[in-house]
Amino acid sequence: MRGGDGEEGSESRVALLKSPHTAEEDGEGLKDRILVETKKLWQIVGPAIFSRVTTYSMLVITQAFAGHLGDLELAAISIVNNVTVGFNFGLLLGMASALETLCGQAFGAKKYHMLGVYMQRSWIVLFFCCVLLLPTYIFTTPVLKFLGQPDDIAELSGVVAIWVIPLHFAFTLSFPLQRFLQCQLKNRVTAYAAAVALVVHILVCWLFVDGLKLGVVGTVATISISWWVNVLILLVYSTCGGCPLTWTGLSSEALTGLWEFLKLSASSGVMLCLENWYYRILIIMTGNLQNARIAVDSLSICMAINGWEMMIPLAFFAGTGVRVANELGAGNGKGARFATIVSVTQSLIIGLFFWVLIMLLHNQIAWIFSSSVAVLDAVNKLSLLLAFTVLLNSVQPVLSGVAVGSGWQSYVAYINLGCYYCIGVPLGFLMGWGFKLGVMGIWGGMIFGGTAVQTMILSFITMRCDWEKEAQKASARINKWSNTIK
C-alpha cells in the first residue's frame, strides 16, 4: 500500500510542479494548458468538496438526533454549535490556513522537509490558542444568561459546551494535517478519512442516543468521537510512511521562528473570522425585526441552502490557494496567474448554474424545509438575494484563495474589516430599519455593500498583481523561513 502511495505521490509532484508556461514552450496550445490546469485543480477541489460536505453532514446528523430528544436539547446543541464552536472553529481554521501559504510555496520550491516543520509549528500555535479559548466553553452558561437567553437553555448549553471541549482540541491536529496533505495533492486521503468518520458518526449516534439512551451528553460526545477518528487516520497516514519526503519525524526545529509563524497565523485567522462573523451578525440583526420568527426562519432556510452550495466555492478556495502557492514557490509567476484565471472562471461558471437554478425554482426551493405558507412566501421573496449571494460567493472565496496562496492575509484582513464592518453592516442597518425594508434590506445592504465591494477590491488587486514579483517574494519568504531553523 505504501509503495502505491509513493508512486502516486511522485506522479502528483511531477504533475503539480509542471508549469503552464512550460507546456506552452513545449508547443501545447491553450486548450491543452487549460485541460492540464483543470486536472491539477480538480485533484484538489473534488476531494475537498466531498470532505467538506461530509463534515457538514456530521453536524446536521447530530442536530437531527438532538431534535428527537426534545426542543430544549436541540436548542442547546444548536446554540453551542453555531455560536461557541462556530466562533472557535472559524478562528482556528483561519490560523491553520497559514500553512496553505507556507507549505504550498515550500512544496513548489521542492523544500519538502519544511512541510513537516511548518505543520509542527502550527500544532504548537493552535494548541496554545485552544487553551486560551477554553473560557468560551467553561463560561457558556453565564454568558448566555447575560445575553438574555432563557435559564433552562443557558444551563443545558453550559453542559453541552463542556462536553464539546474534546472536539475543540481535535481542531488543533485536524486543521494542520488537512492542509499538510492538501499541499501535497493528497486530498483523497482526507476524503477517505472523512467518509470513515461519517460512517462511525452515524453508528455511534445510533448507539449512544437510541441504544444506550445517553441523552444530550451522548449526542454531543458522538461528534467529538467522529472528529478524533478522522484525526487519527490522518495522523497515522502522515507520520507512519504516507509522506516520506515531507514528514521526517518530530523536530526541535519546530520550536524556532514561532513568533513570525504566529503573526502570519493570526492574520489568516482574522481574515477568515471577519467573514465568518459577518453572516452571524446578519442573523442576529434579523432576530431584532418585527415578526422576527418568520424573518429568522426564512433567512435560516436561505443560509442553509447557501451553506450547502458554499462547499463548492470553499473547495475552490482551498484548490486555488494550493495551486497559486505551488506555482509561486516554483518561481513561476505566469503559472500562478494562469491557475488563478482557470479557477475563477470555472467557479464562476458553476455559480452561474446555481444562480439560474435558484431564479427558476425561486418559489419551490423552501419546500424541503418548511410547509408554512408564510415562511415559503418569505423565502420566495428572498430568493433573488440568495441567487446573487451564491453568484458573488462563486468568485469571492476563490480570490481569497489567491490571497492565501500569495501570502496577502494581512492586507485582506484590513479589506474585510473595512468592507464588511465599515460599509456592509451600517448599510444593512440603514436599509433594514431606516428604509424599513426588513430582512431584505439588511441582507441586501450587507451583500451589495460588503461582499460585493470586497469582491471588486480583491478583483482589482488580483488583476493588477505583478506575478513575477510575487514569485520573487515567495522565494525570499521560503529562504527566510528556512533560515530560521538553521
UniProtKB/Swiss-Prot annotation:
Single GO molecular function: xenobiotic transmembrane transporter activity
Region (Disordered): 1-25
Membrane topology listed for this record: Multi-pass membrane protein
Major location (coarse): membrane
GO cellular component assignments: membrane
GO biological process, one term: xenobiotic detoxification by transmembrane export across the plasma membrane
InterPro entries: MATE_euk, MATE_fam
Family: Belongs to the multi antimicrobial extrusion (MATE) (TC 2.A.66.1) family.
Protein name, per record: Protein DETOXIFICATION 27
Species of origin: Arabidopsis thaliana (Mouse-ear cress)
Gene that produces this protein: DTX27
